[in-house]
Amino acid sequence: MTSKTVTRADLASVVCRKVGLSHTESAALVELVLNEICNSLVRGEAVKLSSFATFQVRNKNERIGRNPKTGVEAPISPRRVVTFKAANVLKQRILNSHRARQKK
């Protein structure tokens, strides 16, 4: 398993190479898409990218947690979190890739 992290710059480079836009235009396009995803989530809208994943905002209620160092209970305030649910197509691609590496 690799520990490579794909960055915005990496995505822009791929767009530049495969689409033929300049690097500046590619970076702007990647930024535009990511900003639109963020803005949709801030508005409380789900973002479904077919064959990839669904991002949703979920409300979490207040609950009692525990400080792992001291063991003291403390309230955890209510908040909104983003959830990521991988599409079955993505899950299958990852599984197939894993199986192919296991055979080597």
Swiss-Prot record:
Keyword DNA-binding carried by entry: yes
Disulfide topology: none
One family name in Pfam for this protein: Bac_DNA_binding
Keywords: DNA recombination, DNA-binding, Transcription, Transcription regulation, Translation regulation
PROSITE patterns (alphabetical): HISTONE_LIKE
Family that this chain belongs to: Belongs to the bacterial histone-like protein family.
Quaternary assembly: Heterodimer of an alpha and a beta chain.
Name this polypeptide is given: Integration host factor subunit alpha
The organism of origin for this protein: Bartonella quintana (strain Toulouse) (Rochalimaea quintana)
Designated gene of the protein: ihfA
